[in-house]
C-alpha cells in the first residue's frame, strides 16, 4: 500500500513550486495514514517523529496558496478515469461539508447549522464550510454494483463577512455582491464547470458524459441554468416543490 501511495503522490509534484515543499507535504500525507486520533497538523507531525522540531514550516504549507489545489487532485481524477470503461460515464457527487473549529479567529469560520442535530430543533456549531466533489469508482467493471466515493476536489466555501451597522454604503453594496457570489450554490456551479473543463482537456474524459447527483441546496437556478454541456444533473427536491419551465 505504501508503494502505491508513493506512486500516486509522486504524480502531484507539479502542484508544488519547490521540492522541499513537496517533500514536506508528502511526509504529512504519509503520516495521515498512520496517525491516531484527530488528524490535525500537530498529530501528523507527531506520527512522523517531528514533534521536537520547528512546526512553523508545516503550518505555513497550508497558507497563502503554497500549492495548486487543482493539480493536487488531478492524478486522482485521471486514475479514476483510467479504471472506467470507455463507454462508462463519470458519476460524481457534490455536497458541502462542515469541519468544526474552536478558534474564533480562524479564517472562514462561523456559526453553521449542525447537520447531525436532531430534526425537531436547529443546532448551531462553529466551523468552516467546504465543498467536496467525489467520483464514484465502481467495484465491478461492468453491470450494477457497489461504488466507492473518491474525493477529486475540495474547496473552502466561506460566507461573506457581514460589515458593521454604521459601515459606508459602498461597503454594504460590496457585501451584497459577495453574498451572491459566495453562496454555496454559486460555488458549486463554478466547481461543476471547472470539473467539466478539466475533463474536456483530457483524452480519457473529453467525450465522457458527467453525471452529477446533488443535494437540495444545489437544486436551483444558480446551478441548473449554468450546467455545462455533456453533463447530467440529478437534484433532490422537496415533495412540495414547484417546477416551472425555463422558458
Language model region names:
Residues 1-247:
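Conserved, well-structured functional cores that handle cations and Mg-NTP chemistry
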Amino acid at each position: 500500500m505504501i508503494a502505491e501511495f508513493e506512486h500516486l503522490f509522486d504524480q502531484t509534484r507539479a502542484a508544488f513550486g519547490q521540492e522541499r515543499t513537496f517533500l514536506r507535504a508528502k511526509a504529512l500525507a504519509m503520516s495521515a495514514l498512520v496517525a491516531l486520533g484527530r488528524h490535525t497538523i500537530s498529530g501528523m507531525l507527531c506520527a512522523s517523529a517531528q514533534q521536537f522540531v520547528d512546526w512553523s514550516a508545516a503550518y505555513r504549507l497550508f497558507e497563502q496558496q503554497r500549492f495548486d489545489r487543482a493539480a493536487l487532485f488531478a492524478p486522482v481524477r485521471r486514475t479514476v478515469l483510467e479504471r472506467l470503461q470507455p463507454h462508462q460515464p463519470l458519476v460524481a457527487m457534490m455536497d458541502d461539508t462542515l469541519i468544526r473549529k474552536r478558534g474564533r479567529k480562524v479564517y472562514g469560520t462561523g456559526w453553521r447549522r449542525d447537520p447531525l442535530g436532531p430534526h425537531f430543533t436547529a443546532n448551531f456549531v462553529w466551523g468552516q464550510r467546504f465543498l467536496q466533489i467525489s467520483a464514484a469508482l465502481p467495484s465491478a467493471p461492468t453491470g450494477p454494483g457497489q461504488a466507492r466515493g473518491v474525493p477529486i476536489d475540495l474547496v473552502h466555501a466561506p460566507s461573506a463577512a457581514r460589515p458593521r451597522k454604521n459601515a459606508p454604503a459602498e461597503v454594504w453594496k460590496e457585501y451584497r455582491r459577495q453574498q451572491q457570489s459566495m453562496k454555496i450554490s454559486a460555488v458549486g456551479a463554478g466547481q461543476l464547470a471547472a470539473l467539466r473543463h478539466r475533463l474536456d482537456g483530457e483524452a480519457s474524459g473529453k467525450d465522457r458524459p458527467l453525471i452529477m447527483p446533488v443535494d437540495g441546496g444545489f437544486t436551483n437556478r444558480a446551478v441548473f441554468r449554468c450546467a455545462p454541456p455533456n453533463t447530467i444533473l440529478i437534484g433532490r427536491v422537496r415533495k412540495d416543490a414547484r417546477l416551472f419551465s425555463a422558458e
